[in-house]
């Protein structure tokens, strides 16, 4: 675990990523896609689905980062239709599959909050920290957050790329998150599971970034923590040192 004291200095607000940081699909993406294919009479191994999804999601992400990063609801809809089509090209009715998957991942029942999310949200509030949940997602995230008990009171704290008009790592995305908390970027810490979107991108926009590496697979040179419990402990330790 690598942290820097400078990461915490003068922090007044936190920008939290959503998927992979606060929530994850449950059942897994691979299982849901495989079951969708099965309903059309096509059997695909979950491991193969997982490999395809990671490949095409990453390809799409890289293509987006090379472009202007502009987005809206229609763009996100087209993006996910493209990804689903690439992951499940064998299906006789791809539009039906896409519609099923789009609806599925827009329901709270398709997601779970990590066990450390509820305590972390309460700790942020108790500490008087401003915070927002900021994600490359679309309007479906509002229903998802509203339906998860640990996050239900956070719907008014959402910053969603399709509503901002730009995806991470565009500077406007982080600026919008900071403005929503009424804070300067240098008073804001961004926390998430993607080195580019949650660390390097925020730093270019004047914020600070901290990687949440739940699977311990990320670059060691980036300041990171393994979970939200560690995030809260580190923040409390820093405050205790500052007031000692």
Language-model regions, residue ranges each:
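N-terminal helical cap/lid subdomain that shapes the substrate entry/recognition surface
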Residues: 4-118, 122
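Asp-based, Mg2+/Mn2+-dependent phosphohydrolase catalytic module
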Residues: 1-14, 24, 47, 92-98, ...
């Amino acid at each position: 675990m690598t942290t820097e004291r400078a990461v915490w200095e003068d922090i007044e607000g936190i920008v939290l990523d959503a998927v992979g940081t606060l929530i994850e699909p449950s059942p897994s993406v691979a299982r849901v896609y495989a079951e969708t294919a099965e309903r059309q009479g096509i059997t695909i191994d979950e491991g193969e689905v997982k490999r395809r999804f990671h490949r095409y999601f990453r390809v799409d992400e890289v293509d987006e980062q090379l472009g202007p990063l502009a987005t809206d609801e229609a763009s996100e809809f087209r993006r996910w239709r493209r990804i689903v089509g690439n992951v499940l090209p064998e299906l006789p009715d791809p539009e039906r599959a896409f519609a099923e998957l789009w609806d599925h991942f827009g329901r709270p029942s398709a997601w779970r909050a990590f066990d450390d999310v509820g305590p972390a949200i309460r700790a942020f509030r108790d500490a008087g920290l401003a915070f927002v949940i900021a994600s490359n997602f679309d309007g479906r995230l509002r229903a998802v957050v509203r339906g998860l008990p640990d996050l239900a009171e956070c719907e008014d704290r959402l910053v969603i790329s399709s509503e901002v008009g730009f995806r991470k790592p565009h500077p406007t995305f982080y600026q919008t998150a900071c403005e929503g908390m009424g804070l300067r970027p240098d008073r804001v810490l961004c926390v998430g599971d993607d080195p580019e979107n949650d660390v390097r991108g925020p730093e270019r926009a004047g914020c600070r970034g901290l990687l949440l590496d739940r699977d311990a697979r990320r670059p060691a040179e980036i300041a990171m923590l393994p979970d939200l419990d560690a995030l809260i402990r580190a923040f409390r330790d820093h405050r205790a040192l500052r007031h000692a």
